[in-house]
Amino acid sequence: YSAKEDRDIYKGLTFWSPNVNIFRDPRWGRGHETYGEDPYLTSRLGVKFVEGIQGDGPVMKAAACAKHYAVHSGPESLRHEFDAQASMKDMWETYLPAFEALVTEADVEAVMGAYNRTNGEPCCAHKYLMEDVLRGKWKFEGHYTSDCWAIRDFHEHHMVTSTPRQSAAMALNAGCDLNCGNTYLPVSYTHLTLP
């Protein structure tokens, strides 16, 4: 069913799935969305999910979105202010393998950043995770989106910026292409300092 005014809505869908976070903290209220606590199993199931959504034809009819990049698994009540501390060993052995597989094997079209910070930096403006790893090492060419209202968290909860304008600039400068929320809207793109 589609109303006449809605005939152009939902063309070229992006499904914000799969959730390939590693379920390590039972206080996280979204563990049921994941494939569990095993990085290898999560990567295998995630790759097949993306292939199923995106297909293997010449035209992508729907796009998958790997979420929530990258060290996100609770606790739920602190997700907007939490700073996940992860060693490089833990990051590369636990949290990043599924994302790497979805990008390098399944060519996932989109990646969604998490609400939380990882080692002090918001995941939706994390230079190392977004530039060095995702777009650099893995050669990701799709679009990066924030989780809903995650950019607002920069100035309201993480306190890494003071204003929505600073938060938008921080996210855009780091390569966050799409903001699920309204932080980008009141800002004139011509006033931002972009590289």
Pin down the residues of each PLM region.
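Glycoside hydrolase catalytic-domain context in secreted enzymes
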Residues: 1-192
